[in-house]
Amino acid sequence: TFHCTQAVGKVMRKNKAGVILNIVTTYAYTGSGYVVPSACAKAGVLAMTRSLAVEWAKYGIRTVAIAPGPFPTKGAWSRLAPPGLGIEKKMKDRIPLKRLGEHIELANLATYLISDQAAYINGEVVTIDGGEWLKGAGEMNDLDKIPKAAWKLLQMKRKKKK
């Protein structure tokens, strides 16, 4: 993300315009068990987003980010919330809206943030998680509450993916 941002930033600075939209995660600022490498990387992207918002504003460049909470994806969910273990229900129960995010909601937010209608938004990280982080975020923290047999199965699945 850093190298890509630097490369596109050169062009944007030359053109005196642009919007950089980064996708982080709620656990970039709350932390979460079982996803430490991702949390560290996304926290760095979050800091870069805010830092460049100050540094590159003089070039007409805005940097913004979206911090999604639980949105089902094939990658992470197949390893961390496989079907049949009750993890998805536990996650939904933590969210005040009692549901997971829908990808169209994420797309709509992204579309708005890069539009001219959001021209005064700079350096902001918008959380989209149904209110989960307000209740003590880190959607993967609940993994330690699953039964031991399910945990063993989950660990075996994670090792197979590597």
Model regions: which residues?
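Residue(s) in the substrate-gating loop at a strand-loop-helix junction
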Residues: 25
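Active-site loop immediately N-terminal to the catalytic Tyr-X3-Lys motif
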Residues: 30-36, 58-59, 98, 116
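C-terminal substrate-recognition "lid" of short-chain dehydrogenase/reductases
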Residues: 2-5, 62, 99-128, 133-134
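Short, flexible catalytic-loop segment of classical short-chain dehydrogenase/reductase
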Residues: 29, 67-78
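Alpha-helical segment proximal to the catalytic Tyr-Lys
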Residues: 10, 54-58, 119
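Short C-terminal tail/terminal secondary-structure segment
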Residues: 111, 122-162
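Active-site loop-to-helix junction immediately N-terminal to the catalytic Tyr of the SDR YXXXK motif
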Residues: 31-40, 51, 76-79
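Active-site helix of classical SDR
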Residues: 5, 41, 49
